[in-house]
Structure formats: C-alpha cells, structure tokens
Swiss-Prot record:
Positions annotated to bind NADP(+): 191-196
Matching Gene3D superfamilies: Glutamyl-tRNA reductase, N-terminal domain, NAD(P)-binding Rossmann-like Domain
Catalyzed chemical reaction(s): (S)-4-amino-5-oxopentanoate + tRNA(Glu) + NADP(+) = L-glutamyl-tRNA(Glu) + NADPH + H(+)
InterPro entries: 4pyrrol_synth_GluRdtase, 4pyrrol_synth_GluRdtase_dimer, 4pyrrol_synth_GluRdtase_N, GluRdtase_CS, GluRdtase_dimer_dom_sf, GluRdtase_N_sf, NAD(P)-bd_dom_sf, Shikm_DH/Glu-tRNA_Rdtase
Recorded family membership: Belongs to the glutamyl-tRNA reductase family.
One GO biological process term: protoporphyrinogen IX biosynthetic process from glutamate
Protein origin, superkingdom: Bacteria
A GO term, aspect molecular function: NADP binding
Positions of the catalytic residues: 50
Enzyme class, first EC level, given as a word: oxidoreductase
Keyword NADP: yes
Gene: hemA
Species assigned in the record: Corynebacterium diphtheriae (strain ATCC 700971 / NCTC 13129 / Biotype gravis)
UniProt-recorded name of the protein: Glutamyl-tRNA reductase
C-alpha cells in the first residue's frame, strides 16, 4: 500500500470548478466512505477548503486507485470525468507525502505561510477518523505533516509572508481603496464561523470604527459581536434577514457564510450608495460577481486573490529544508516498517528449521539425555541468532536509505519466504451510516 493524492487547487483549476467540488461535513463523510468502499483504496481523507480539494488515500494499485478517486469525485459532484482529469493533479508514494507536508506548512497556499491550513488538515483528519476511514498509514502521515507544519512556523519567518487568506484579502481591499487602514470605516460581517471571526479580528486591528455582524443564528452573531467589543471594537449583531437594511450605512462588507446561495447580489445594493468595498471569503461564492458592475462597488473574492497572488513566488528555503528533513525521517521510518514483516518471517523460518532439525536429532540419537539435548538446543539457537543478527540489522539500515532496491523482496526471494499481506486497516462493513447529502 502506498499513499496517493488526487486533487485540485487554485493553482490548477478555476474557482467555478472548485465550487462544484466543495464539500460540507456531511458530503465529505459520505465521500470518504465511498472511497474506501473501492477495492483499490484502503484508507481515505479529504481536505476541502476555499481554494483546495484533495483526496488522500492508501492504494494497492496506482492506476486503479486514481481512476477510483476520479469516479467517486464525479459521482459526488456531477462534473464530467474528462473535465475533472483536465484539472486534477496526482502525487504518489514519497511525492504524495512531501505534498501533504508542503500543504500543511503553508508552502502550497495562495498566501505562502498562512496558518489556517494546519487547522484545516487537522479537521479533515478528525472528520475521516470519526468516519472510520483513517488507519495507521494515514495517521502516521498526518501526524508527521502536522509536526512539519509546526516546525516550519516555529523555526522560520515564513509567517511574515502572509498570516492568512483574511489578511491577504484585507490588504488587497486596502490597496484598491488606496488606503493603509480602515480608520473611520464601518463594516458588515456576514457569518459567524472561523473565517468570519478572523475577519472581524483583522478588521479591528486595521482600525475599523464599527462592525455589524449578521448570521442565520442570531446567538452566534451576538457572540462574535461581544468578542469584538471585548477586543475594543464597537460592534452589534442583527438578524441575517436585516443585512440589506444596513448596506447603505457601511463602507466594507465581508461575507464568509459558505452558503449555497448568494448572500448579496447587485439588485440588493442601493443605487446611490457611493463607494463600497466587498470581500468574499467563501467557496462557493457568497457575493454575486455582478455587484462589481454597480458604480462605486469594488469586489475582492477568491478568484481575484488567486490572480493577484504570484504563483511563481519563491518558497522559503528554510521551510523547504525542514520539509526535506521531515520527509526523509518519515520515508526512512516507512521503509523500515515495510521490511519488518520480511525480517520477522525470516526469523520465524529460522526458528522453524531449528525445531525441525532438533526433532530429527532427537529421533536419530535417542540415547541423548535431557540436559545434553537442552544444551545442544540452546547452542543451535545462539548460533542462528548470531548469524541472523548482523544481516537483519543491516537490512533495516539499508532499507532506511532511499534507493531502488526492495530489500524486503530480496529477503523473500533469497530465503523463499511467504510474507503475509498487511491487513486492510478499514473495515467497510463497520463504517457509520451515510449522512443525508445537502
């Protein structure tokens, strides 16, 4: 079994296609269950963010595994298979492990160095674990990747490149406004989740005068407004249905609801409003593109941010060095684990031969007393253990090194061993019942 990544991101696909593949918790749970139901896939988890959709799986067959993932994504989204193949990228084995480490470190993000992705990978892992589709292989890779991400953010200055999508969006909005802060401005924040909370916090740091929070659950909107007040920013909460009533009173709108319908369209904006900056942090999009056609209205969304971000931005060398170190440690440990069953089989084979030969000796020399036989038995086992010790230690050391030699296969061929296949970690019959899709 080797790790496989099949995905698309802001680097490979248009936002409109990413929208079609975005998943809420229920869809993600159903999809990982569908993935491990395929014979070629043993474990699976899905990272779904505003600019990324990636399937991580353990597969016994590269080509079949890729095809199975694409078919499941097609069934989930309704997107044509050929269209999917045109935008999906694939990573396999060590390259897949390296990709997850780079993603978790923020090196593959639209804003290099952003930290939100660590939490998003952790959430994807917990979601798949609860769904019963994560086994020891993905568990080990995720833990190694999270450790790598923590090291990168702790030991390098990569955070200076960009704290998050929120800060990047606000910086782009300020650039369009020819301003350095939001002093004297009033804002409407739609949503009360993690992204909306980050937006409210960042607006406060940039000098916003007042924040109005609207959310479909009023209590959550009130909590976010209370947090803003505690942080020293004037804020209030309103019912979500009243969001249009305050449009004429604000200078900035930030929407992060992740709804399936637009929260604001051009028809909702008062004709004589004046300048209005709109920031859409959601995928699928919250704010209709047609708002940008209204005089005085400016729109910053995920697609705009992708165009602004430099896809050729140089990666932090210190961060890349850490990723390389952690990848080598992870892959070395993996190769040692891969050869362990063959080593264990060799020792069992040797023990079986000893038992067989001692039984023959006992039959051929029945006059040997029990003490002498026990001494012969101990001596033979010591000799065999000493003969096997150096080769088994050395084969693990050699296996830890990268290369094209399969030492576990070599041991099996040299000694005629039959190594049992590693059991599948995920039992499809024990998965939770499907969740109703949105």
């Amino acid at each position: 079994m080797s790790v496989l990544v099949v995905g698309m991101s802001h680097r490979s696909a248009p936002v409109a296609l990413l929208e079609k593949l975005s998943m809420d918790d229920g869809v993600r749970t159903n999809t990982v269950s569908d993935l491990v139901a395929r014979p070629s896939l043993a474990e699976a988890m899905i990272v779904s963010t505003c600019n990324r959709l990636e399937v991580y799986a353990m597969t016994s067959s590269f080509h079949t595994g890729v095809n199975d993932v694409v078919e499941v994504l097609h069934d989930m989204s309704g997107v044509d298979m050929e269209e999917l193949r045109g935008y999906l990228y694939v990573r396999y084995a060590d390259a897949a492990a390296e990709h997850m480490m780079e993603v978790t470190s923020g090196l593959d993000s639209m804003v290099v160095g952003e930290q939100q992705i660590i939490g998003q990978v952790r959430t994807a892992y917990h979601s798949a674990t609860e769904a019963g589709t994560v086994g020891p292989a993905l568990h080990g890779l995720v833990q190694a990747s999270l450790h790598t991400g923590k090291r990168v953010h702790t030991e390098t200055d990569i955070d200076d490149a960009g704290a998050s999508m929120v800060s990047f969006a606000c910086d782009e909005a300020l650039a369009q406004m020819s301003a350095t802060n939001f002093a004297g401005c009033r804002a409407l924040v739609l949503g009360a989740g993690a992204m909306a909370s980050l937006a409210a916090t960042h607006l406060g740091r940039l000098g916003i005068e007042h924040i109005t929070v609207a959310n479909r659950t009023f209590e959550r909107a009130q909590r976010l407004a209370d947090h803003a007040v505690e942080a020293g920013v004037a804020a209030s909460a309103i019912e979500f249905e009243r969001r249009m009533d305050v449009l004429c009173d604000v200078d900035v709108v930030v929407s992060a609801t992740g709804a399936n319908t637009f929260t604001i369209e051009a028809a909702n904006i008062p004709a004589a409003h004046g300048d209005l900056m709109m920031i859409d942090l959601s995928l699928p999009r919250d704010i209709s593109d047609d708002v940008a056609e209204v005089p005085g209205v400016h729109l910053v969304n995920i697609e705009k941010l992708r165009d602004v971000a430099s896809s050729g931005e140089a990666k932090d060398h210190a961060a890349q060095r850490i990723v390389a170190e952690e990848l080598e440690a992870y892959t070395s440990a993996q190769r040692i684990r891969d050869v362990a069953p063959a080593v264990a089989a060799l020792r069992r084979h040797a023990s079986s031969l000893i038992d067989s030969e001692l039984a023959r000796l006992s039959t051929r020399v029945p006059s040997m007393d029990e003490d002498d036989f026990s001494e012969v038995q101990r001596t033979v086992r010591r000799v065999v253990d000493k003969l096997l010790h150096q080769p088994t230690v050395r084969v693990k050391e050699l296996a830890a090194q990268s290369g094209t030699v399969s030492y576990d296969t070599a041991i099996q061929e040299l000694f005629g061993l039959a190594v049992e296949a590693t059991p599948v970690a995920v039992n499809v019959d024990e998965l939770p019942e499907r969740i109703n899709k949105r």
